[in-house]
From Swiss-Prot:
Protein name: Chaperonin GroEL 1
Database matches in Pfam families: Cpn60_TCP1
Gene Ontology terms: cellular component: cytoplasm
Function statement: Together with its co-chaperonin GroES, plays an essential role in assisting protein folding. The GroEL-GroES system forms a nano-cage that allows encapsulation of the non-native substrate proteins and provides a physical environment optimized to promote and accelerate protein folding.
Region (Disordered): 524-547
Length: 547
């Protein structure tokens, strides 16, 4: 086992601080409407240009192992905030640094780190409560557009497209971001339920120009079983042919004799039919077929339940106004399933979403929910170059997450103002003893986001903070226009969830770092045992170490 190097007490905390500062300095330059870009070298392809805090943070690894520990902990703040709220990563990083720096001064002066942590936790609880009371619901499309615009670094086109998408597919709908072929950024909305399986054979196509099969008012056979023999299917096919309606077959697989017979009947005009493989795999396939059955009012043909093709009647089949099938996707529009059955299915999926622990499973469940409830919107991001495309796509994804957060928990004034408006509530909080100093740490840290926004805009942060504190409500500093005004009316708003998550994550990690008393890392190769700098190795401050 390799020898370890240990830092204790203040030496350990100062090493952490150096790492926190390095990462924070790189991330904080992106904060606010006048924040700058960061260029990140890639081992292959062109460099990435970004103004997204978490993208910058994820790229940072420091050579000094002790400093790197501090940087990695703050990186965790940024990525957790991004995962939960989708935005606010730079704010979270700035807050984490401020809390740790202020706390470190007090620990060095002899205050108890554990009491400071308790004070910080109590202060954060009060501020979160205050943010919730300041919060207003996003009632209209205009507010959603404003949130999207702010998160997309002031790009009004992106804000408007996201608001349109959310209006069309609703709160539960799925909105995906893809790369467009041209320069324009556009929105496509898919009505009804779409799944990623196309026709089994191109002979089923009804529109040669578009290479798609469009079936109006069809019957829909939904089966978990493979369809390989035609003998069992003949009674059902005869019933469908007599009805004069088209038929869609969605099954585990359609092969051999069955596929050949269907194609021949289609070509001869005996039966307008199209065969599609069932979506998904394993248990997820069964659930998705059940979703389609509920939506179309049909029954899933399952061996587990003893169903047989030869006993099926038209009442066992689903119905829809229209089904469109291309080589990659199938879209079912206006299924005839009952409202009660669909709502029951939706309720079941929501319960599963609440109880599932895997992010992947949750994402798949949300996709299924969206297909039953609202539909799917696709934002196609256009740009002139690949570098611009990457940067723009990242901005659209950020803005999309922020608008979802705004719809979920409402909005507060942006530009760091919401944190300042929470300060009076902290004045009343007196936990007593050394915990009061923990409250003071948060009081100071809450001013940092606005200070950094102002400094990135080229003005003195302290002056801006004092001026904003003299006002009330949404009065604040608009860094884009460099005027003091009502930020809500000016469209400078932030999702409450983003502000809350940024503060909670920053305080959680920073207060843990404050209680650090020792750090252990592998000794760099070639470093002398005494702790001084070895040949060609960085000096880790070994002279200050306690053994």
């Amino acid at each position: 086992m390799a020898a370890k190097e240990i830092f204790f007490h203040q030496s350990a905390r100062e090493a952490i601080l150096r790492g926190v500062r390095t990462l924070s300095d790189a991330v904080a330059v992106t904060l606010g409407p006048k924040g700058r870009n960061v260029v990140i070298e890639k081992s292959f392809g062109s460099p990435t240009i970004t103004k997204d805090g978490v993208t910058v943070a994820k790229e940072i690894d420091l050579e000094n192992k002790f400093e790197n520990m501090g940087a990695q902990m703050v990186k965790e703040v940024a990525s957790k905030t991004s995962d939960k709220a989708g935005d606010g990563t730079t704010t979270a990083t700035v807050l984490a640094r401020a809390i740790y720096e202020e706390g470190l001064k007090l620990v060095a002066a002899g205050h108890s780190p554990m009491d400071l942590k308790r004070g910080i936790d109590k202060a954060v609880e009060v501020v979160v409560g205050e943010l919730k009371s300041l919060s207003k619901p996003t009632a209209d499309k205009k507010a959603i557009t404003q949130v999207g615009t702010i998160s997309a670094n002031g790009d009004e086109t992106i804000g408007a497209i996201i608001a349109d998408a959310m209006e069309k597919v609703g709160k539960e709908g799925v909105i995906t971001v893809e790369e467009a072929k041209g320069l324009e950024t556009t929105l496509d909305v898919v009505e009804g339920m779409q799944f990623d399986r196309g026709y089994v054979s191109p002979y089923f196509v009804t529109n040669r120009e578009r290479m798609e099969a469009v079936l109006e008012d069809p019957y829909i056979l939904i089966s978990e079983k493979k369809v390989s023999s035609m003998q069992d299917m003949i009674p059902l096919l005869e019933q469908v042919a007599r009805s004069g309606k088209p038929l869609i077959i969605i099954a585990d697989d359609i092969e051999g004799e069955a596929l050949a017979t269907l194609v021949v009947n289609k070509i001869r005009g005996v039966l307008n039919v199209c065969a599609v493989k069932a979506p998904g795999f394993g248990d997820r396939r069964k659930e998705m077929l059940q979703d389609i059955a509920v939506l179309t009012g049909g029954t899933v043909v399952s061996e587990d339940l003893g169903h047989k093709f030869e006993t099926l009647t038209l009442t066992d089949l689903g119905r829809a106004k229209r089904v469109t099938v291309d080589k990659d996707n199938t879209t079912v529009v206006d299924g005839v399933g009952t409202k009660a059955a669909i709502e029951g299915r939706i309720k079941l999926i929501r319960t599963q979403i609440d109880s599932v622990t895997s992010d992947y499973d949750r994402e798949k469940l949300q996709e299924r929910l969206a297909k039953l409830v609202g539909g799917v919107a696709v934002i196609n991001v256009g740009a002139a170059t690949e570098t611009e495309m990457k940067e723009k796509k990242a901005r659209v994804e950020d803005a999309l997450h922020a608008t979802r957060a705004a719809v979920e928990e409402g909005i507060v004034p942006g530009g760091g103002v919401a944190y300042l408006r929470a300060l009076p509530a902290l004045e009343k909080l007196k936990p007593g003893g050394e915990q009061d100093f923990g409250v003071a740490i948060i009081r100071r840290a809450l001013q940092e986001p606005l200070r950094k926004i102002a400094s990135n805009a080229g003005v003195e942060g302290a002056v801006v903070i004092n001026k904003v504190r003299e006002g009330t409500g949404a009065f604040g500093y608009n860094a884009r226009t460099e005027v003091y005004e009502d930020l809500e009316k000016a469209g400078v708003i932030d999702p409450t969830k983003v502000e809350r998550t940024a503060l909670q994550n920053a305080a959680s990690v920073a207060s843990l770092l404050l209680t650090t008393e020792a750090m252990v890392a592998e000794r760099p190769k070639g470093k002398a045992k005494g702790g001084g700098a070895g040949a060609g190795m960085p000096d880790y401050g070994g002279d200050d170490m306690d053994y």
